[in-house]
């Protein structure tokens, strides 16, 4: 049973997620016993230390509406966004993503060979289309020129969003995205043995499968009651009579 769950997690689950999945299947086992069984079978969860990057220069008078409170009571209340990069044989590939703080899923993303305003606008456009164009969403990001650009401000304004930026030089003000990037790269490296890709096309295809199939729909999270982001969002819609919402 433990080996099966571990394999289905793509060899990434550690003890907490393993315990949660066993409990979901009706097996009431202690954390200590699971830890011993995993050690005995050399089943190790994906792990690495986080590396925080520095923030960017100030962005006018736009306030920080989150103040490091990375929680939401419902979908589409608070989104966080950022850009990271991967090295490929074709050169760098930049990934921009938008994460919903309620169910922790990625609602919008895109990749490109340049980290410009068009990239973050594309990720935002996907997020809006996927979620039914909600209004009054808080969109929180760092002060990179992509997010402070006129193109992005125009796109966010057309969607009636509230823009929010962390304080200058403090990456912890966007910690929810920083931790996602750390887990993304740790687990990709754990599964593939490397985060290097031969081509940008290969990297994009792999990121599509990892984000859309594995992370959003298969990877269970202890903070969500050991549900996946998709399951957690579906449960909220069912409990609140919003099955018609995307």
How should these model regions be labeled?
Residues 1-246:
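Charged DNA-binding/catalytic regions of mobile-element recombinases
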């Amino acid at each position: 049973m433990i080996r099966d769950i571990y394999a289905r997690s793509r060899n990434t689950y550690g003890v907490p997620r393993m315990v949660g999945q066993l409990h979901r299947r009706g097996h009431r086992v202690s954390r200590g016993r699971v830890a011993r069984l995993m050690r005995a079978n050399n089943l190790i969860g994906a792990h690495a230390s986080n590396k925080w990057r520095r923030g960017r220069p100030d962005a006018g008078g736009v306030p920080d509406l989150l103040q490091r409170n990375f929680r939401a009571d419902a979908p589409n209340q608070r989104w966080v966004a950022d850009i990271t990069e991967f090295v490929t044989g074709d050169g760098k590939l930049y990934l921009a993503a938008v994460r919903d703080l309620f169910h922790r899923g990625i609602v919008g993303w895109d990749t490109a060979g340049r980290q410009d305003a068009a990239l973050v606008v594309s990720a935002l456009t996907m997020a809006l289309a996927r979620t039914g164009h909600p209004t009054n969403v808080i969109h929180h990001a760092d002060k990179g020129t992509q997010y402070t650009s006129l193109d992005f401000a125009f796109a966010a304004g057309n969607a009636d969003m509230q823009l929010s930026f962390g304080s200058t030089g403090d990456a912890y003000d966007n910690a929810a995205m920083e931790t996602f990037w750390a887990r993304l790269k740790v687990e990709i490296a754990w599964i593939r043995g490397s985060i290097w890709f031969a081509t940008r096309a290969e990297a994009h295809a792999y990121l599509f499968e990892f984000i859309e199939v594995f992370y959003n729909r298969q990877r269970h999270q202890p903070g969500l009651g050991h549900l996946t982001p998709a399951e957690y969002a579906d449960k909220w819609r069912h409990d609140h009579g919003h099955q018609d919402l995307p």
